[in-house]
């Protein structure tokens, strides 16, 4: 690229670090602004589908990721009361054969650590809390909590559902989804019957569900359980939940679920919020990504995956067009990502119970393979190929205008 824009990334979560790793590989000048003073083991498990794993492999992180992840053999939907198997979608080798990349489950902190090792440490600014951004003709002014100000050619909001950068584009507010999720981590040795074979298990009830899967290379089992809630409380990853309240909410469920809940020392509670899709993520010098752009409910397990796709797309566009046409880069990124993430957001609101709708009993193996192939719109998406194709088309259009 000719000319390297100074890209300021606000937020060093999965979205921000993924973009920083992309920009580092592309040689794009950037910095990362994170309000925390240090990175810590926050959050629970996360599912990484082939559409995101493919991107992470492209960043050269295949070995590091495999070392900390687990590789579930299948996604099982089971009955809440008697643990009867309702449906099964193969993952493992079948998923890799179909989509060219594995399906992983990983602790969020482990994924974050892998990404943190892939970024330029000199570009990382901790204790840097951005409180406002002001776009001007020639740059963007960033205002910090300590009263200082800085300027950047491009600012990317990777700062989550309460994004400061998003507030410069729209006045909308997060929407409470009417429930909460309680998350926990349990040593695999405490629940050997769930750890013996690596699986994603989802127990579906009428108004709640519980899902669990291995993380930390199989040493831990991560679980999340939904609970109804009439009003919003905390949205923090670090809010402590109530073990007794959770156990009461799942009283009468099968022994696998109640035993898993009882085995957790501490649980965290996170109230569910999202936002309606918006058509505009960018201006001349601002862009949104991840939860700042498209916060979604966790029921499709694609929030982090879509943030990683965002990172590849935005990184490729900035690397290609540079300072000569930042606006072109941001518009192209927006055009590629808004329709896809809006579709994922909409599907995420349906909830996991839909996975059990084909039947109440498990069908033949072919049914599972069909379910795996039905996920092609998600797992089969190649963000790198989509970005390359769009960049070629944009270059052709620009060349025609110049001629």
Segments the model singles out, each with a brief description of its role:
Residues 124, 138-140, 204, 267-276:
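Short gly/ser/thr-rich secondary-structure transition/capping motifs
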Residues 198-232, 243, 250, 272:
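Active-site substrate-recognition segment that forms the wall
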Residues 2-7, 49-187, 230-247, 381-403:
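Conserved N-terminal helical subregion
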Residues 176-177, 195-199, 255-271:
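A short coil-to-beta-strand element that immediately follows conserved catalytic motifs
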Residues 34-37, 91-98, 228-233, 348-351, ...:
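Short glycine/proline- and charge-enriched loop/turn segments
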Residues 2-5, 67, 259, 300-301, ...:
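C-terminal helical "tail/cap" subdomain of flavin- and related membrane-associated enzymes
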Residues 38-54:
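Conserved N-terminal glycine-rich FAD pyrophosphate-binding loop of Rossmann-like flavoproteins
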Residues 8, 12-37, 156-157, 182, ...:
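Conserved mid-domain beta->alpha element of the FAD-binding
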């Amino acid at each position: 690229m000719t000319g390297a824009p100074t890209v300021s990334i606000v937020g060093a979560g999965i979205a921000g670090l993924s973009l920083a790793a992309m920009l580092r590989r592309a040689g794009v000048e950037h910095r990362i602004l994170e309000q925390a003073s240090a990175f810590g083991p926050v959050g629970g498990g996360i599912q990484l589908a082939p559409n995101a794993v493919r991107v992470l492999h492209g960043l050269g992180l295949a070995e590091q990721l495999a070392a900390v992840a687990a590789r579930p053999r299948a996604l099982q939907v089971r009955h809440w009361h008697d643990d009867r198997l309702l449906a099964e979608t193969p993952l493992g080798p079948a998923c890799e054969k179909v989509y060219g990349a594995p399906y992983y489950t990983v602790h969020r902190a482990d994924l974050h650590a892998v990404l943190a090792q892939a970024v330029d440490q000199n570009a990382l600014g901790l204790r840097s809390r951005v409180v406002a951004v002001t776009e001007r003709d020639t740059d963007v002014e960033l205002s910090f909590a300590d009263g200082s100000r800085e300027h950047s050619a491009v600012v990317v909001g990777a700062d989550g559902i309460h994004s400061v950068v998003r507030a410069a584009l729209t006045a909308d507010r997060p929407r409470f989804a009417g429930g909460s999720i309680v998350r926990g981590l349990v040593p695999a040795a405490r629940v050997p019957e769930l750890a013996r074979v690596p699986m994603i298990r989802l127990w579906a009830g009428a108004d709640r569900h519980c899902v669990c899967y291995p993380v930390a290379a199989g040493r831990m089992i991560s679980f999340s359980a939904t609970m109804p809630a009439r009003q919003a409380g905390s949205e923090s990853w670090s809010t402590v939940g109530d073990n007794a309240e959770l156990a009461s909410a799942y009283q009468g469920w099968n022994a696998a679920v109640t035993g898993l809940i009882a085995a957790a020392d501490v649980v965290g509670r996170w109230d569910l919020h999202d936002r309606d899709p918006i058509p505009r993520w960018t201006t001349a010098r601002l862009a949104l990504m991840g939860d700042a752009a498209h916060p979604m409910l966790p029921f499709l397990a694609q929030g982090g995956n879509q943030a990683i796709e965002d990172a590849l797309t935005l990184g490729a566009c900035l690397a290609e067009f540079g300072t000569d046409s930042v606006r072109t880069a941001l518009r192209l990124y927006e055009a590629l990502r808004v329709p896809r993430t809006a579709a994922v957001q909409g599907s995420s609101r349906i909830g996991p119970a839909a996975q059990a709708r084909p039947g109440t009993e498990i069908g033949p193996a072919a049914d599972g393979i069909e379910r795996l192939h039905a996920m092609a719109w998600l797992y089969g998406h190649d963000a790198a190929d989509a970005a390359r194709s769009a960049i070629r088309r944009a270059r052709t259009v620009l060349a025609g205008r110049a001629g």
